[in-house]
């Protein structure tokens, strides 16, 4: 008998989903044994998805209009998230497909033998340039955040354009958090390919504008990479409190459990009408009449633990 995830109970489908993620991530890291690595766990939720429609989302690296990728080579570990801008829907354009294509290109460039993870902004530049040159081009807009681990010196490099972002935690405290890039309230910097060359496109930012950083990381550090569906709904203090017990955690199943809970938390708070969410606070600071409550949105989260093997 053939079955799909929709034939299963929600709980069973989650187990299948989590096991599938772990299989994919474990198989991507076997060739880098003995080198510094990122032990990764991934989860997400589309604001429109059915409660049990998980496996498809993982298989095509999409959660609604969000997309993601992870890559592992002997020189570098690379992770990325992209958030397609939903405003294109009124023109019949799926920005989720744009975000997915951008992440696919980033993944392919990250797998090149010469790429060592030291310049994720160039990775973003090359990937976006390739999108613009495609004959059957994919149109839309997306934010993007790339984080790479340069294995040789155990340095984390990043390139962030827009309001997705990442945090690095050490010993239960925030070591680094990326800054948002906004044109105005709820209007992030974004990469755009318009459907027509002459089409007026106000928000056509350049990948060269991505903010970069580099951080020396060590055993046990945690890296949290996510789209704004997480950061707009879960305050930093709650994220830190949730992640504090995971310092030094290298068991993938424990990281997966933690990232599952983060997504569940963000989803619950996004639907709240009473919670004072980070998005509501930003709206108030911008003199917007938003009141209180969360922001229903697609959510994509990658949680990674830095593992530096002992040198024998």
From Swiss-Prot:
Residues 42-306 form the PPM-type phosphatase domain. Signal peptide: none annotated. It catalyses: O-phospho-L-seryl-[protein] + H2O = L-seryl-[protein] + phosphate; O-phospho-L-threonyl-[protein] + H2O = L-threonyl-[protein] + phosphate. Mn(2+) 1 binds at residues 83-84. It comes from Drosophila mojavensis. One of its GO terms (biological process) is dephosphorylation. Its cofactor is Mg(2+); Mn(2+). The keyword Metal-binding applies. The gene is fig. This is Protein phosphatase PTC7 homolog fig. GO terms for cellular component: mitochondrion. CDD domains: PP2Cc. Its EC number is 3.1.3.16.
